[in-house]
Amino acid sequence: MNKEHEHGGAFRASAEKRERNSRTEYAKKLKTKQIYDWLPLQLEMAHHWIEHEKTQTKRNMARGAVHFCQFGENIGCEQNEERPVVIISNNTVNSTSGNVLVIPLTKNLKIRTFPKTGQPILTKEGNPIPRFQSHYFLFKNKYDFLAFDSAAKTEETTSVSKIRLKDHLGSLDEEDISRLETRLKWSFGL
């Protein structure tokens, strides 16, 4: 290998490293700004909780209900911002605790496809099948309160304060709650 070729490769590697570092620094600055932008709302919600703890704890939340939830700004792949969630904790917990267990919804459906053609694999009803066993699809044509076809991401199940929950959008039927339970059991290894 000649010297010029060696130096060209080293130069390219160095340029790629500078580019990665530049993207990393930009991502850090952006995340810092997003967290600082979220802080005033987070403080407002925390103060509201302190002032209204008893009424928040007694808020009537039902298993299978879909609400908007303000997740704020978080780290890594954790859910961020305001998004719909399904309340999955049992109604005893829901009526006595200041927190509830929720499954976040996303409009980004990851669909199972045939390996050779890339075409979606569909149910007998013509609906796409989730790529991941931990996801369960909820369709707008069944739940018109949803703005989009949505995936319930059971691997992202988390406990949130009721103060984070906003508008009640609607509720899932028992069949879909049961199917969500199956995915939850798989996600938690139960």
Labelled PLM ranges:
Residues M1-L190:
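Conserved functional hotspots at enzyme active or ligand-binding sites that engage polyanionic ligands
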